[in-house]
Amino acid sequence: MIENFKDFLENITLTEAQMKDAKTKYEGVCGCLDRHFYDSSYNEAHKFLFGSYKHRTCVRPIDPEQDVDVLFKIDKDTYEKYKDNPGGLLQEVRNALKDTYTTTDRIKAWGKVVLVNFAEGKHNVEVLPALEQDDNTFLIPNTENGGSWEVFDPRAQVDAFCASNQKTQCLTKKLAKMMKTWVRNTKTLDYSSYILLEDIIKFLDDYYPNGQGKTNFDQIIGEFLTYVHSRVDDEDPRKSHLKTAKTRASNAIEYEKQGKHIEASEEWRKVFGEEFPKSEKNEAKNNCGVFGFKEAPRPWGML
């Protein structure tokens, strides 16, 4: 399965064109807000990218739920203006954007964010207006339960991810992409990217602190599913999904040991979906069921 997993990672990794599109979209949104709040053109210092596009753990194909998460930094005066009316700030952000992005029904403000939806197959942008504090955390508006301001620390996970990814020689990023694809392929599974990444970092710290080494991805994924399954409560809705996935992973590994590459790839496709490549053939067996020679070699040579 080594080549299958190599091709699988290529299949789910965003193309350069898709990454460029994401950058164009979030820079456009932040540039629009720069003109509105600062009367200036796009300023890199006024935004903070976080989430999967910061980590580069985003996957394809791009679906309608896939957003670029970005903080837009407001100044102190704007915060004071909306200190007692956090919902008002979200509406001002929305109104500023609708002058540029004229499909106003596709720009929505709720909770803590303003979501700008673009065409199908393109990146949406989820922007959080935020006041940066002296300790490098942010205050963000929350319109729920009467409205409030909350402390948000996206840098903590960004730093944790970068440290883990460097230590594991990019295994953190690769495993995150694959497991995100599993979550996406499991339609009724509710497993946030934030929690998933935390679990991956903890798992790798315990099992693969120095990276993959010579261990194949099938073993790592099976161990990760078992690791999380053993740690979630029985009442956790993820429990049954984890059990199903780890059983399929175990079946795939056993098939692979038997040289049944086709059956192994089919089990992995049940876990990851059609982005995981099919194997075309199994290993040949002789009549005794042993891989290798069709007949025993004759050390005495031909007579």
Task: Specify the residue positions occupied by each region the protein language model found.
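Terminal (often C-terminal) interaction modules
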Residues: M1-D7, E235-L303
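N-terminal regions immediately upstream of nucleotidyltransferase
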Residues: M1-E65, D77-G87
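Glycine-rich, often proline-containing surface loops adjacent to acidic residues and nearby aromatics
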Residues: K6, Q66-K76, P154-A160
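Catalytic cores of NTP-dependent nucleotidyl/adenyl transfer enzymes across multiple folds
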Residues: A17, D21-K23, E27-C30, T102, ...
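Histidine/cysteine- and/or acidic
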Residues: M19-K25, E65-D75, E80-E126
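Residue-level recognition of the N-termini of beta-strands and the immediately preceding loop/turn
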Residues: N43-H46, K112, D236-S240
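Extracellular/secreted glycoprotein ectodomains characterized by long, lumenal stretches
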Residues: L49, C58-P61, I74-Y79, L89-L90, ...
